[in-house]
UniProtKB/Swiss-Prot annotation:
The lineage of its organism: Bacteria, Pseudomonadati, Pseudomonadota, Gammaproteobacteria, Enterobacterales. The chain crosses the membrane at residues 8-28, 35-55, 71-91, 105-125, 127-147, 159-179, 203-223, 235-255, 271-291, 297-317, 326-346, 373-393, 408-430, 455-475. GO terms for cellular component: plasma membrane. It catalyses: a quinone + NADH + 5 H(+)(in) = a quinol + NAD(+) + 4 H(+)(out). It is an enzyme of class 7 (translocase). NCBIfam families: NDH_I_N (TIGR01770), PRK05777.1-1 (NF004439). This is NADH-quinone oxidoreductase subunit N. Keywords: Cell inner membrane, Cell membrane, Membrane, NAD, Quinone, Translocase, Transmembrane, Transmembrane helix, Transport, Ubiquinone. PANTHER family: NADH DEHYDROGENASE (PTHR22773). InterPro entries: NADH-Q_OxRdtase_suN/2, ND/Mrp_TM. The keyword Nucleus does not apply. Belongs to the complex I subunit 2 family.
Length: 485
Protein backbone atom coordinates (compact mmCIF):
# COMPACT_ATOMS: atom_id res chain seq x y z
CA UNK A 1 0.00 0.00 0.00
CA UNK A 2 1.42 3.41 -1.01
CA UNK A 3 0.90 6.51 1.11
CA UNK A 4 0.27 9.60 -1.03
CA UNK A 5 0.55 13.28 0.05
CA UNK A 6 -3.27 13.32 0.01
CA UNK A 7 -3.29 10.50 2.59
CA UNK A 8 -0.83 12.39 4.80
CA UNK A 9 -3.06 15.49 4.72
CA UNK A 10 -6.03 13.34 5.77
CA UNK A 11 -3.98 12.05 8.73
CA UNK A 12 -2.71 15.51 9.79
CA UNK A 13 -4.47 15.65 13.23
CA UNK A 14 -3.13 12.20 14.15
CA UNK A 15 0.38 13.04 12.90
CA UNK A 16 0.49 16.43 14.67
CA UNK A 17 -0.63 15.00 18.03
CA UNK A 18 1.84 12.10 17.58
CA UNK A 19 4.65 14.60 16.86
CA UNK A 20 3.62 16.62 19.94
CA UNK A 21 3.90 13.45 22.07
CA UNK A 22 7.48 12.93 20.83
CA UNK A 23 8.43 16.61 21.37
CA UNK A 24 6.99 16.67 24.93
CA UNK A 25 8.75 13.37 25.72
CA UNK A 26 12.11 14.77 24.53
CA UNK A 27 11.47 18.03 26.39
CA UNK A 28 10.88 16.12 29.65
CA UNK A 29 14.07 14.10 29.09
CA UNK A 30 16.05 17.29 28.36
CA UNK A 31 14.76 19.50 31.18
CA UNK A 32 11.64 19.47 33.32
CA UNK A 33 9.74 22.73 32.85
CA UNK A 34 6.04 22.69 33.68
CA UNK A 35 5.16 25.85 31.74
CA UNK A 36 7.12 24.78 28.63
CA UNK A 37 5.56 21.31 28.43
CA UNK A 38 2.04 22.63 29.07
CA UNK A 39 2.56 25.24 26.32
CA UNK A 40 3.91 22.65 23.85
CA UNK A 41 0.90 20.40 24.52
CA UNK A 42 -1.62 23.22 24.02
CA UNK A 43 0.14 24.41 20.82
CA UNK A 44 0.12 20.84 19.44
CA UNK A 45 -3.58 20.32 20.17
CA UNK A 46 -4.46 23.72 18.66
CA UNK A 47 -2.40 22.93 15.55
CA UNK A 48 -4.26 19.61 15.21
CA UNK A 49 -7.58 21.48 15.45
CA UNK A 50 -6.51 23.98 12.76
CA UNK A 51 -5.34 21.10 10.53
CA UNK A 52 -8.94 19.83 10.33
CA UNK A 53 -9.59 22.63 7.80
CA UNK A 54 -6.93 21.15 5.47
CA UNK A 55 -8.38 17.66 6.03
CA UNK A 56 -11.77 19.00 4.92
CA UNK A 57 -10.22 20.36 1.71
CA UNK A 58 -8.69 16.94 0.91
CA UNK A 59 -12.12 15.25 0.91
CA UNK A 60 -13.34 11.92 2.27
CA UNK A 61 -11.18 8.84 1.70
CA UNK A 62 -10.05 5.46 3.05
CA UNK A 63 -6.48 6.20 4.12
CA UNK A 64 -5.76 2.59 5.10
CA UNK A 65 -8.03 -0.47 5.45
CA UNK A 66 -8.24 0.44 9.15
CA UNK A 67 -9.06 4.16 8.87
CA UNK A 68 -11.67 6.18 7.02
CA UNK A 69 -11.43 9.99 7.03
CA UNK A 70 -14.73 11.75 6.31
CA UNK A 71 -16.96 14.48 7.75
CA UNK A 72 -18.05 12.19 10.59
CA UNK A 73 -14.43 11.49 11.58
CA UNK A 74 -13.60 15.21 11.42
CA UNK A 75 -16.48 16.17 13.75
CA UNK A 76 -15.56 13.58 16.39
CA UNK A 77 -11.82 14.31 16.05
CA UNK A 78 -12.60 17.99 16.66
CA UNK A 79 -14.66 17.19 19.77
CA UNK A 80 -11.90 14.94 21.19
CA UNK A 81 -9.27 17.64 20.56
CA UNK A 82 -11.44 20.32 22.23
CA UNK A 83 -11.95 18.12 25.29
CA UNK A 84 -8.20 17.32 25.46
CA UNK A 85 -7.35 21.02 25.14
CA UNK A 86 -9.75 21.90 27.97
CA UNK A 87 -8.26 19.11 30.13
CA UNK A 88 -4.71 20.49 29.68
CA UNK A 89 -5.98 24.01 30.41
CA UNK A 90 -7.77 23.00 33.63
CA UNK A 91 -4.80 20.85 34.70
CA UNK A 92 -2.20 23.65 34.65
CA UNK A 93 -3.33 25.50 37.82
CA UNK A 94 -4.15 22.18 39.52
CA UNK A 95 -0.61 20.92 38.86
CA UNK A 96 0.89 24.18 40.17
CA UNK A 97 -0.01 23.03 43.68
CA UNK A 98 1.17 19.45 43.01
CA UNK A 99 4.47 18.42 44.60
CA UNK A 100 5.43 15.44 42.41
CA UNK A 101 6.29 15.26 38.68
CA UNK A 102 3.92 17.47 36.70
CA UNK A 103 5.02 17.08 33.07
CA UNK A 104 3.94 13.47 32.49
CA UNK A 105 0.31 14.54 32.94
CA UNK A 106 0.32 16.31 29.55
CA UNK A 107 2.08 13.37 27.91
CA UNK A 108 -0.66 10.99 29.09
CA UNK A 109 -3.43 13.35 27.92
CA UNK A 110 -1.81 13.62 24.47
CA UNK A 111 -1.51 9.82 24.13
CA UNK A 112 -5.16 9.43 25.18
CA UNK A 113 -6.10 12.09 22.59
CA UNK A 114 -4.28 9.98 19.95
CA UNK A 115 -6.51 7.05 20.92
CA UNK A 116 -9.60 9.26 20.61
CA UNK A 117 -8.58 10.44 17.11
CA UNK A 118 -7.92 6.83 16.04
CA UNK A 119 -11.41 5.85 17.27
CA UNK A 120 -13.02 8.74 15.38
CA UNK A 121 -11.41 7.47 12.16
CA UNK A 122 -11.77 3.72 12.85
CA UNK A 123 -13.31 1.63 10.08
CA UNK A 124 -12.25 -1.79 11.33
CA UNK A 125 -12.61 -3.80 14.55
CA UNK A 126 -8.79 -3.88 14.88
CA UNK A 127 -8.51 -0.06 14.88
CA UNK A 128 -11.53 0.09 17.23
CA UNK A 129 -9.70 -2.10 19.76
CA UNK A 130 -6.37 -0.28 19.33
CA UNK A 131 -8.08 3.09 19.80
CA UNK A 132 -9.93 1.96 22.94
CA UNK A 133 -6.71 0.61 24.48
CA UNK A 134 -4.76 3.74 23.49
CA UNK A 135 -7.35 5.93 25.22
CA UNK A 136 -7.72 3.62 28.27
CA UNK A 137 -4.08 2.90 29.19
CA UNK A 138 -3.06 6.56 29.78
CA UNK A 139 -6.26 7.01 31.83
CA UNK A 140 -5.02 4.38 34.33
CA UNK A 141 -2.12 6.72 35.12
CA UNK A 142 -4.18 9.91 34.95
CA UNK A 143 -6.88 8.64 37.36
CA UNK A 144 -4.18 7.76 39.91
CA UNK A 145 -2.09 10.88 39.29
CA UNK A 146 -2.75 12.20 42.82
CA UNK A 147 -1.45 8.85 44.09
CA UNK A 148 -0.63 10.21 47.57
CA UNK A 149 -4.38 10.52 48.13
CA UNK A 150 -5.89 7.15 49.03
CA UNK A 151 -9.08 7.80 47.01
CA UNK A 152 -7.19 8.55 43.78
CA UNK A 153 -5.03 5.43 44.09
CA UNK A 154 -8.09 3.30 44.88
CA UNK A 155 -9.95 4.71 41.85
CA UNK A 156 -6.97 3.94 39.59
CA UNK A 157 -6.73 0.31 40.77
CA UNK A 158 -10.51 -0.20 40.34
CA UNK A 159 -10.49 1.33 36.87
CA UNK A 160 -7.41 -0.65 35.76
CA UNK A 161 -8.72 -4.06 36.87
CA UNK A 162 -12.28 -3.56 35.58
CA UNK A 163 -11.11 -1.98 32.32
CA UNK A 164 -8.79 -4.94 31.67
CA UNK A 165 -11.71 -7.33 32.22
CA UNK A 166 -13.93 -5.29 29.86
CA UNK A 167 -11.21 -5.28 27.18
CA UNK A 168 -10.97 -9.08 27.37
CA UNK A 169 -14.75 -9.36 26.84
CA UNK A 170 -14.49 -6.99 23.86
CA UNK A 171 -11.59 -8.92 22.31
CA UNK A 172 -13.28 -12.30 22.79
CA UNK A 173 -16.45 -10.90 21.22
CA UNK A 174 -14.46 -9.72 18.19
CA UNK A 175 -12.87 -13.17 17.88
CA UNK A 176 -16.32 -14.81 17.77
CA UNK A 177 -17.56 -12.28 15.18
CA UNK A 178 -14.48 -13.01 13.05
CA UNK A 179 -14.95 -16.78 13.44
CA UNK A 180 -18.48 -16.51 12.03
CA UNK A 181 -18.05 -13.76 9.41
CA UNK A 182 -14.39 -14.11 8.35
CA UNK A 183 -13.90 -10.32 8.31
CA UNK A 184 -13.28 -7.44 10.74
CA UNK A 185 -13.87 -4.44 8.46
CA UNK A 186 -17.10 -2.53 9.25
CA UNK A 187 -18.05 -2.31 5.56
CA UNK A 188 -17.31 -6.00 4.87
CA UNK A 189 -19.29 -6.98 7.98
CA UNK A 190 -22.20 -4.91 6.65
CA UNK A 191 -22.16 -6.88 3.37
CA UNK A 192 -21.98 -10.26 5.13
CA UNK A 193 -24.54 -9.69 7.89
CA UNK A 194 -27.57 -10.13 5.64
CA UNK A 195 -29.70 -13.16 4.82
CA UNK A 196 -30.50 -14.13 8.40
CA UNK A 197 -26.82 -14.40 9.37
CA UNK A 198 -27.47 -12.05 12.30
CA UNK A 199 -29.44 -14.84 13.99
CA UNK A 200 -26.42 -17.16 14.07
CA UNK A 201 -25.71 -18.05 17.76
CA UNK A 202 -21.94 -17.48 17.41
CA UNK A 203 -22.46 -14.01 15.94
CA UNK A 204 -25.03 -13.07 18.60
CA UNK A 205 -22.64 -14.26 21.32
CA UNK A 206 -19.83 -12.21 19.75
CA UNK A 207 -21.85 -9.01 19.58
CA UNK A 208 -23.19 -9.70 23.09
CA UNK A 209 -19.64 -9.85 24.49
CA UNK A 210 -18.74 -6.69 22.55
CA UNK A 211 -21.74 -4.91 24.10
CA UNK A 212 -20.41 -5.90 27.56
CA UNK A 213 -16.95 -4.46 26.77
CA UNK A 214 -18.23 -1.27 25.15
CA UNK A 215 -20.93 -0.89 27.83
CA UNK A 216 -18.19 -0.74 30.46
CA UNK A 217 -16.22 1.89 28.53
CA UNK A 218 -19.40 3.99 28.12
CA UNK A 219 -20.47 3.31 31.76
CA UNK A 220 -23.90 1.95 30.82
CA UNK A 221 -25.99 0.02 33.37
CA UNK A 222 -25.19 -2.69 34.52
CA UNK A 223 -21.50 -2.11 33.64
CA UNK A 224 -21.38 1.26 35.39
CA UNK A 225 -20.24 0.40 38.93
CA UNK A 226 -16.78 1.94 38.50
CA UNK A 227 -18.08 5.33 37.33
CA UNK A 228 -18.95 7.28 40.53
CA UNK A 229 -15.87 6.04 42.44
CA UNK A 230 -13.48 6.83 39.59
CA UNK A 231 -15.02 10.26 38.91
CA UNK A 232 -14.74 11.10 42.61
CA UNK A 233 -11.23 9.73 43.10
CA UNK A 234 -9.67 11.13 39.91
CA UNK A 235 -8.35 14.73 39.87
CA UNK A 236 -10.99 17.16 38.51
CA UNK A 237 -9.23 17.72 35.11
CA UNK A 238 -9.04 13.92 34.60
CA UNK A 239 -12.75 13.54 35.42
CA UNK A 240 -13.32 16.16 32.69
CA UNK A 241 -11.50 14.00 30.13
CA UNK A 242 -13.24 10.80 31.27
CA UNK A 243 -16.68 12.40 30.98
CA UNK A 244 -16.08 14.02 27.58
CA UNK A 245 -13.29 12.88 25.21
CA UNK A 246 -13.36 9.21 26.25
CA UNK A 247 -17.16 8.85 25.97
CA UNK A 248 -17.49 10.89 22.74
CA UNK A 249 -14.76 8.96 20.87
CA UNK A 250 -16.08 5.53 21.87
CA UNK A 251 -19.71 6.42 21.16
CA UNK A 252 -18.66 7.81 17.77
CA UNK A 253 -17.01 4.55 16.69
CA UNK A 254 -20.02 2.52 17.95
CA UNK A 255 -22.26 4.74 15.79
CA UNK A 256 -20.09 4.02 12.73
CA UNK A 257 -20.10 0.27 13.44
CA UNK A 258 -23.91 0.21 13.75
CA UNK A 259 -24.29 2.30 10.60
CA UNK A 260 -22.07 0.15 8.35
CA UNK A 261 -22.78 -3.26 9.89
CA UNK A 262 -26.54 -3.28 10.58
CA UNK A 263 -26.18 -4.91 14.01
CA UNK A 264 -29.38 -3.17 15.12
CA UNK A 265 -31.38 -5.21 12.59
CA UNK A 266 -31.21 -8.16 14.99
CA UNK A 267 -34.29 -8.11 17.22
CA UNK A 268 -32.38 -9.75 20.09
CA UNK A 269 -29.65 -7.08 20.04
CA UNK A 270 -32.23 -4.27 19.79
CA UNK A 271 -34.09 -5.61 22.85
CA UNK A 272 -30.86 -5.91 24.88
CA UNK A 273 -29.82 -2.35 23.93
CA UNK A 274 -33.30 -1.01 24.75
CA UNK A 275 -33.19 -2.62 28.22
CA UNK A 276 -29.68 -1.18 28.81
CA UNK A 277 -30.85 2.29 27.67
CA UNK A 278 -33.95 2.17 29.90
CA UNK A 279 -31.96 0.99 32.94
CA UNK A 280 -29.20 3.59 32.36
CA UNK A 281 -31.68 6.47 32.12
CA UNK A 282 -33.74 5.52 35.18
CA UNK A 283 -30.97 4.14 37.41
CA UNK A 284 -28.46 6.90 36.58
CA UNK A 285 -30.96 9.62 37.49
CA UNK A 286 -32.28 7.87 40.62
CA UNK A 287 -28.78 7.28 42.02
CA UNK A 288 -27.82 10.93 41.41
CA UNK A 289 -30.72 12.12 43.60
CA UNK A 290 -29.01 11.35 46.91
CA UNK A 291 -25.48 12.53 46.03
CA UNK A 292 -23.83 15.33 48.01
CA UNK A 293 -20.54 15.01 46.11
CA UNK A 294 -20.73 16.96 42.84
CA UNK A 295 -18.27 14.70 40.97
CA UNK A 296 -20.23 11.57 41.92
CA UNK A 297 -23.43 13.38 40.92
CA UNK A 298 -21.98 14.23 37.50
CA UNK A 299 -20.74 10.62 37.22
CA UNK A 300 -24.25 9.20 37.71
CA UNK A 301 -25.60 11.94 35.45
CA UNK A 302 -23.22 10.83 32.65
CA UNK A 303 -24.72 7.30 32.89
CA UNK A 304 -28.18 8.72 32.15
CA UNK A 305 -26.86 10.91 29.29
CA UNK A 306 -25.34 7.86 27.59
CA UNK A 307 -28.73 6.16 28.05
CA UNK A 308 -30.40 9.03 26.16
CA UNK A 309 -27.83 8.66 23.36
CA UNK A 310 -28.49 4.93 23.20
CA UNK A 311 -32.12 5.72 22.27
CA UNK A 312 -30.84 7.50 19.14
CA UNK A 313 -28.47 4.58 18.42
CA UNK A 314 -31.34 2.06 18.57
CA UNK A 315 -33.32 4.28 16.16
CA UNK A 316 -30.34 4.52 13.75
CA UNK A 317 -31.94 2.35 11.06
CA UNK A 318 -34.87 4.79 10.74
CA UNK A 319 -32.85 7.50 8.95
CA UNK A 320 -30.20 10.21 9.07
CA UNK A 321 -32.00 12.14 11.81
CA UNK A 322 -30.50 9.75 14.41
CA UNK A 323 -26.96 10.72 13.29
CA UNK A 324 -27.95 14.37 13.55
CA UNK A 325 -29.48 13.83 17.01
CA UNK A 326 -26.33 12.16 18.34
CA UNK A 327 -24.06 14.88 16.90
CA UNK A 328 -26.10 17.75 18.38
CA UNK A 329 -26.54 15.97 21.73
CA UNK A 330 -22.82 15.19 22.07
CA UNK A 331 -21.79 18.79 21.30
CA UNK A 332 -24.25 20.04 23.95
CA UNK A 333 -23.04 17.40 26.43
CA UNK A 334 -19.39 18.30 25.71
CA UNK A 335 -19.73 22.03 26.42
CA UNK A 336 -22.05 21.52 29.42
CA UNK A 337 -19.65 18.99 30.98
CA UNK A 338 -16.58 21.15 30.23
CA UNK A 339 -18.28 24.07 31.99
CA UNK A 340 -19.41 22.04 35.03
CA UNK A 341 -16.10 20.21 35.54
CA UNK A 342 -14.24 23.43 34.72
CA UNK A 343 -15.90 25.18 37.66
CA UNK A 344 -14.92 22.25 39.93
CA UNK A 345 -11.33 22.49 38.61
CA UNK A 346 -11.20 26.26 39.22
CA UNK A 347 -12.53 25.80 42.76
CA UNK A 348 -9.97 23.03 43.40
CA UNK A 349 -6.86 24.83 42.08
CA UNK A 350 -4.19 25.41 43.17
CA UNK A 351 -5.08 23.92 46.57
CA UNK A 352 -3.38 20.83 47.91
CA UNK A 353 -5.47 17.92 49.09
CA UNK A 354 -8.81 16.63 47.76
CA UNK A 355 -10.82 18.53 45.12
CA UNK A 356 -13.63 20.93 46.01
CA UNK A 357 -16.22 18.29 45.18
CA UNK A 358 -18.55 18.55 48.18
CA UNK A 359 -21.82 20.34 47.42
CA UNK A 360 -21.26 22.34 50.63
CA UNK A 361 -18.17 23.95 49.01
CA UNK A 362 -20.48 25.66 46.49
CA UNK A 363 -23.01 26.95 49.01
CA UNK A 364 -23.42 30.72 48.58
CA UNK A 365 -20.85 30.90 45.75
CA UNK A 366 -22.96 33.61 44.07
CA UNK A 367 -22.28 36.12 46.86
CA UNK A 368 -18.51 36.21 46.32
CA UNK A 369 -18.05 34.81 42.76
CA UNK A 370 -21.29 35.79 40.96
CA UNK A 371 -20.09 35.14 37.38
CA UNK A 372 -18.75 31.69 38.28
CA UNK A 373 -22.07 30.84 39.98
CA UNK A 374 -23.96 32.04 36.87
CA UNK A 375 -21.77 29.80 34.66
CA UNK A 376 -22.44 26.78 36.89
CA UNK A 377 -26.18 27.54 36.83
CA UNK A 378 -26.19 27.65 33.01
CA UNK A 379 -24.36 24.30 32.88
CA UNK A 380 -26.81 22.65 35.29
CA UNK A 381 -29.78 23.98 33.29
CA UNK A 382 -28.24 22.71 30.05
CA UNK A 383 -27.56 19.24 31.48
CA UNK A 384 -31.16 19.19 32.74
CA UNK A 385 -32.39 20.06 29.22
CA UNK A 386 -34.08 23.38 30.05
CA UNK A 387 -35.21 25.45 26.99
CA UNK A 388 -32.90 28.24 25.76
CA UNK A 389 -29.85 26.02 26.38
CA UNK A 390 -28.01 23.66 24.02
CA UNK A 391 -28.91 20.69 26.24
CA UNK A 392 -32.59 21.23 25.41
CA UNK A 393 -31.93 21.09 21.64
CA UNK A 394 -30.10 17.76 22.02
CA UNK A 395 -32.80 16.24 24.23
CA UNK A 396 -35.54 17.45 21.88
CA UNK A 397 -33.74 15.73 18.98
CA UNK A 398 -33.49 12.45 20.95
CA UNK A 399 -37.22 12.59 21.77
CA UNK A 400 -38.07 13.33 18.12
CA UNK A 401 -35.96 10.38 16.93
CA UNK A 402 -37.55 8.09 19.54
CA UNK A 403 -41.05 9.11 18.44
CA UNK A 404 -40.12 8.68 14.75
CA UNK A 405 -38.89 5.11 15.47
CA UNK A 406 -41.96 4.34 17.66
CA UNK A 407 -39.78 3.56 20.69
CA UNK A 408 -42.58 4.64 23.01
CA UNK A 409 -41.39 3.13 26.29
CA UNK A 410 -37.89 4.57 25.76
CA UNK A 411 -39.41 7.99 24.99
CA UNK A 412 -41.33 7.65 28.27
CA UNK A 413 -38.06 6.79 30.06
CA UNK A 414 -36.39 9.91 28.59
CA UNK A 415 -39.27 12.11 29.84
CA UNK A 416 -39.31 10.52 33.33
CA UNK A 417 -35.49 10.58 33.54
CA UNK A 418 -35.41 14.27 32.57
CA UNK A 419 -37.99 15.07 35.26
CA UNK A 420 -35.93 13.26 37.92
CA UNK A 421 -32.73 14.92 36.64
CA UNK A 422 -34.31 18.34 36.96
CA UNK A 423 -34.49 17.89 40.75
CA UNK A 424 -30.82 17.19 41.41
CA UNK A 425 -29.50 19.69 38.83
CA UNK A 426 -31.64 22.43 40.37
CA UNK A 427 -30.47 21.35 43.84
CA UNK A 428 -26.90 22.19 42.78
CA UNK A 429 -28.03 25.48 41.18
CA UNK A 430 -30.09 26.55 44.24
CA UNK A 431 -27.21 25.85 46.66
CA UNK A 432 -25.12 28.45 44.77
CA UNK A 433 -27.55 31.20 45.88
CA UNK A 434 -28.05 30.22 49.55
CA UNK A 435 -26.39 32.15 52.38
CA UNK A 436 -22.66 31.55 52.28
CA UNK A 437 -20.99 29.94 55.33
CA UNK A 438 -18.90 32.34 57.42
CA UNK A 439 -15.68 30.55 56.46
CA UNK A 440 -15.92 28.97 53.00
CA UNK A 441 -13.69 25.89 52.75
CA UNK A 442 -12.74 26.50 49.11
CA UNK A 443 -12.95 29.42 46.73
CA UNK A 444 -11.89 30.14 43.16
CA UNK A 445 -9.04 32.67 42.71
CA UNK A 446 -10.33 36.27 42.50
CA UNK A 447 -8.90 36.63 38.96
CA UNK A 448 -10.26 33.25 37.74
CA UNK A 449 -11.90 34.81 34.65
CA UNK A 450 -8.49 35.95 33.34
CA UNK A 451 -6.93 32.49 33.61
CA UNK A 452 -6.93 30.08 30.64
CA UNK A 453 -9.29 27.71 32.49
CA UNK A 454 -11.65 30.59 33.27
CA UNK A 455 -11.74 31.63 29.59
CA UNK A 456 -12.58 28.02 28.55
CA UNK A 457 -15.43 27.92 31.10
CA UNK A 458 -16.82 31.30 29.95
CA UNK A 459 -16.65 30.31 26.25
CA UNK A 460 -18.43 27.02 27.06
CA UNK A 461 -21.22 28.91 28.87
CA UNK A 462 -21.54 31.37 25.99
CA UNK A 463 -21.78 28.57 23.39
CA UNK A 464 -24.37 26.69 25.47
CA UNK A 465 -26.56 29.81 25.57
CA UNK A 466 -26.01 31.09 22.01
CA UNK A 467 -26.44 27.67 20.35
CA UNK A 468 -29.42 27.00 22.62
CA UNK A 469 -31.18 30.06 21.20
CA UNK A 470 -29.79 29.80 17.63
CA UNK A 471 -28.77 26.17 16.94
CA UNK A 472 -28.80 26.43 13.13
CA UNK A 473 -24.98 26.81 12.68
CA UNK A 474 -24.39 23.68 14.78
CA UNK A 475 -27.11 21.71 12.96
CA UNK A 476 -25.55 22.70 9.61
CA UNK A 477 -22.10 21.47 10.74
CA UNK A 478 -23.54 18.18 12.04
CA UNK A 479 -25.43 17.63 8.75
CA UNK A 480 -22.17 18.08 6.83
CA UNK A 481 -20.48 15.54 9.12
CA UNK A 482 -22.11 12.47 7.66
CA UNK A 483 -20.07 9.26 7.21
CA UNK A 484 -18.80 8.19 3.80
CA UNK A 485 -21.03 5.28 2.73
Amino acid sequence: MTITPQNLIALLPLLIVGLTVVVVMLSIAWRRNHFLNATLSVIGLNAALVSLWFVGQAGAMDVTPLMRVDGFAMLYTGLVLLASLATCTFAYPWLEGYNDNKDEFYLLVLIAALGGILLANANHLASLFLGIELISLPLFGLVGYAFRQKRSLEASIKYTILSAAASSFLLFGMALVYAQSGDLSFVALGKKLGDGMLNEPLLLAGFGLMIVGLGFKLSLVPFHLWTPDVYQGAPAPVSTFLATASKIAIFGVVMRLFLYAPVGDSEAIRVVLAIIAFASIIFGNLMALSQTNIKRLLGYSSISHLGYLLVALIALQTGEMSMEAVGVYLVGYLFSSLGAFGVVSLMSSPYRGPDADSLFSYRGLFWHRPILAAVMTVMMLSLAGIPMTLGFIGKFYVLAVGVQAHLWWLVGAVVVGSAIGLYYYLRVAVSLYLHAPEQPGRDAPSNWQYSAGGIVVLISALLVLVLGVWPQPLISIVRLAMPLM
